[in-house]
């Protein structure tokens, strides 16, 4: 069965990487959601260790293969787009996924939106995206994605993954990252906060003040900079994560 470009399919064939994903995912006796199981290389191990595996697969051809190959009683195959699912809030899950790169951000924001039921997620992502998610203050890759993910999750790099670990071979390397939900975080304003970050990073060449002043009170911004000892010409990528959220609360 050939991979389909429209679904962003690249099948993981490296057993060492598969084992690292499973070992880092804390799947033992847990409820697991797998996004895009494909031919089931990862799924076959998950069903042996997890309490229950819910696998979301939108490709009917892959669904047919999985139904033939996996008959475990704790395996539930759902022929549906994960992004369109309305989840039962009474259950808790860990997520494990080798996700299509073109919907990485969408999946992460779906996880944030459903934070009540997702404790952690182990994700295979494009190496470039992993660097952006893991980036720290003053890094060139530091972005709204870095801030939004790191505010709600502790983020860990599990391993780098060569493009040769997939078939067909993609053009870029990948990385496995793990997101662990932070305790006692207020998720209620996450959509509003992300809209704020989009404005803050709308032009990386401009100062943060110039990006924000047409939408928020300029004097409040300058007063905040003075309080936190930031230069008025500071750029968005040079602001600490916790200070960004404090500024957001001050201006909203």
UniProtKB/Swiss-Prot annotation:
Leader sequence residues: none
Cited Pfam families: RrnaAD
Any GO molecular function: RNA binding
Keyword DNA repair attached: no
Protein's UniProt keywords contain S-adenosyl-L-methionine: yes
Principal subcellular localization: cytoplasm
EC numbers for this chain: 2.1.1.182
The reaction(s) this protein catalyses: adenosine(1518)/adenosine(1519) in 16S rRNA + 4 S-adenosyl-L-methionine = N(6)-dimethyladenosine(1518)/N(6)-dimethyladenosine(1519) in 16S rRNA + 4 S-adenosyl-L-homocysteine + 4 H(+)
Subcellular location: Cytoplasm
GO CC annotation: cytosol
Disulfide bonds: none
InterPro entries with a match to the protein in the record: KsgA/Erm, rRNA_Ade_diMease-like_C, rRNA_Ade_Mease_Trfase_CS, rRNA_Ade_methylase_Trfase_N, rRNA_adenine_dimethylase, SAM-dependent_MTases_sf
Residues holding S-adenosyl-L-methionine: 10, 12, 36, 57, 81, 98
Keyword list, A-Z: Cytoplasm, Methyltransferase, RNA-binding, rRNA processing, S-adenosyl-L-methionine, Transferase
Family: Belongs to the class I-like SAM-binding methyltransferase superfamily. rRNA adenine N(6)-methyltransferase family. RsmA subfamily.
Function noted in UniProt: Specifically dimethylates two adjacent adenosines (A1518 and A1519) in the loop of a conserved hairpin near the 3'-end of 16S rRNA in the 30S particle. May play a critical role in biogenesis of 30S subunits.
Protein name per its UniProtKB record: Ribosomal RNA small subunit methyltransferase A
Organism: Mycoplasmopsis pulmonis (strain UAB CTIP) (Mycoplasma pulmonis)
